[in-house]
Regions:
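N-terminal regulatory/effector-sensing and dimerization cores
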Residues: 2-93, 120, 124
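Aromatic/histidine-rich interaction motifs
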Residues: 87-110
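Terminal helix-turn-helix DNA-binding modules in bacterial transcription factors
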Residues: 196-236, 256-274
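Short, Lys/Arg-enriched, Trp-marked, Pro/Gly-tolerant hinge/linker segments that flank
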Residues: 95-100, 119-126, 136-182, 195-207
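Short hydrophobic/aromatic patch on the recognition helix
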Residues: 53, 189, 238-239, 243
Length: 274
């Protein structure tokens, strides 16, 4: 992407909840602003509760999942990784208690939405300028946040494991291979991951692989055998069994359903509404 863009959490799902609820990453920076409800995020393997007036900053290529809950509503601003507006180089979860700060960020989001919806000349430049303003708001908010306690050994281990998953999920490396790289046993890694994320070490890796697979299946026309090879599966048959086991559907069924969903007038209308 070349310009900042804003959308609702529903739009960020692109018609499929798994796009947010499975472990994955974005090629761009993202700032999530919750305005209603209560959800759960797992960021770099650490589980966090996300509530109203919470801001979640996700630098590009940060592994995360987000479940906003049935009543959750929020807005997302995606910024290009190469954007001139400075963004933090680590994930942040901020609870914005100051009413003025809450109103300021909401106003920036609403201004960006208006520009996108009106599609006037030079609207992309205006949205980028508002994204720069959002960056200033963010840095000011960071100054007023209480200092975070130093991460413990368990959290550092899980974050390092999440980084390895994100870097090597399209390879043949197993959870045991990553544990060996980190200098711990698979049992210890599993125990720590489950305590901090609610998921085992193997489940974190599986979710990331599944997201990558479903994205290529549903958003591309590549042959299934090619996708299997790109993601480090030993064969197309094993890839198909993996998808069937975790989704209950074959890769071809998933692709057909995704195309039908995109072609649906209801889905098209939902993508247009903010």
């Amino acid at each position: 992407m070349d310009h900042a863009t804003v959308m609702t959490l529903v739009q960020w799902m692109h018609g499929a909840e798994w796009r947010l609820t499975l472990q994955h990453s974005c090629p761009c920076h993202a700032l999530v602003w919750m305005t209603r409800g209560q959800g759960v995020a797992v960021v770099e393997g650490v589980r966090r509760g996300i509530g109203v007036h919470n801001a979640l900053v996700l630098p590009a290529r940060t592994m995360f999942s987000l479940d906003p809950g049935k009543t959750g509503f929020g807005l997302v601003c995606e910024m290009p990784a190469q954007a001139t507006a400075p963004m933090p180089d680590r994930p942040l979860h901020m609870r914005i208690r100051d009413v003025m700060g809450q109103n300021e960020l909401t106003a920036i989001f609403e201004g960006m939405q208006r520009e996108q919806n009106d599609a006037r000349p030079f609207s992309e430049e205006v949205v980028d300028a508002q994204a720069a303003l959002m960056s200033v708001w963010l840095r000011r908010a960071m100054l007023s946040q209480p200092e975070e306690p130093a991460s413990g050994a368990a959290e550092r281990l899980v974050r390092a494991y999440a980084a390895l998953i994100e870097r090597h999920h399209a390879s043949t490396r197993s959870m045991a291979d990553h544990a060996r790289t980190l200098g711990v046993t698979p049992t210890h890694l599993t125990r720590v991951c489950r305590r901090l994320s609610g998921l085992s070490a193997a489940e974190l890796l599986t979710e990331r692989s599944l997201h990558a697979a479903r994205d290529l299946i549903e958003a591309s026309d590549r042959p299934m055998a090619q996708i299997a090879a790109e993601l480090g599966f030993g064969s197309a048959a094993y890839f198909s069994r993996f998808i069937l086991h975790h989704t209950g559907r074959t890769p071809s069924d998933l692709r057909s359903a995704a195309r039908a969903r995109i072609a649906s007038p209801v889905a098209t209308a939902a993508r247009q509404v903010i």
